[in-house]
Amino acid sequence: MNARGLGSELKDSIPVAELSASGPFESHDLLRKGFSCVKNELLPSHPLELSEKNFQLNQDKMNFSTLRNIQGLFAPLKLQMEFKAVQQVHRLPFLPSSNLSLDILRGNDETIGFEDILNDPSQSELMGEPHVMVEHKLGLL
């Protein structure tokens, strides 16, 4: 046995490539690659899915560029500051929020869409014990 020890002899004698699985039945190596996220491996199921996900962002960018061309740089900056201020205000975690002020800033308060009918607060996924939810939000648990 040399000065490196028994572990180094075993490591040198057995190639690592032979121990790794390959082929269609290969399992994910958690120690080397970490946890796998299926969400990152999925492709959009429809060509319009990405467009629908980014619709509001694209709509806001278009409105800001129109405002900048018509009224100058001040109008989109003011509107962006109002958006940031409205998005920072939150209710307690167990109370449903309609984000009415954000809808007013975007002009969505004058339209009726499917989210107005199908977005019933009583069917929310966040229903739970109020005290536990607040303690979790504040980091006390």
UniProtKB/Swiss-Prot annotation:
Asked if the keyword Ubl conjugation belongs to this entry, the reply reads: yes
Q: Name where it mostly resides.
A: cytoplasm
Cellular component (GO) terms are:
cytoplasm; cytosol; endoplasmic reticulum; membrane; nuclear speck; nucleus
Kindly list the places in or outside the cell where this protein is found, as annotated in its UniProt entry: Cytoplasm, Cytosol; Nucleus; Microsome membrane
Segment forming the signal sequence: none
Query: What tissue specificity does the UniProt entry give?
Result: Widely expressed.
Alphabetized, the UniProt keywords read: Chaperone, Cytoplasm, Endoplasmic reticulum, Isopeptide bond, Membrane, Microsome, Nucleus, Ubl conjugation
Q: InterPro entries recorded for this chain?
A: Ump1 (IPR008012)
Q: Show the cross-link location (Glycyl lysine isopeptide (Lys-Gly) (interchain with G-Cter in SUMO2)).
A: K39
Picking any one GO biological process from the record gives:
proteasome assembly
**Any keyword Membrane?**
yes
Induction: what does the entry report? By interferon gamma.
Q: Which Pfam families match?
A: UMP1
Record note on quaternary structure = Constituent of preproteasomes, but not of mature 20S proteasomes. Within the preproteasome, may directly interact with PSMB1/beta6, PSMB4/beta7, PSMB5/beta5, PSMB6/beta1 and PSMB9/beta1i. Interaction with PSMB8/beta5i is controversial. Forms tetramers.
- PANTHER family given for it? PROTEASOME MATURATION PROTEIN (PTHR12828:SF3), PROTEASOME MATURATION PROTEIN UMP1 (PTHR12828)
Q: What family does the database annotate? A: Belongs to the POMP/UMP1 family.
What's this protein's function? Molecular chaperone essential for the assembly of standard proteasomes and immunoproteasomes. Degraded after completion of proteasome maturation. Mediates the association of 20S preproteasome with the endoplasmic reticulum.
Report the protein name in the record: Proteasome maturation protein
Organism equals Mus musculus (Mouse)
What is the gene name? Pomp
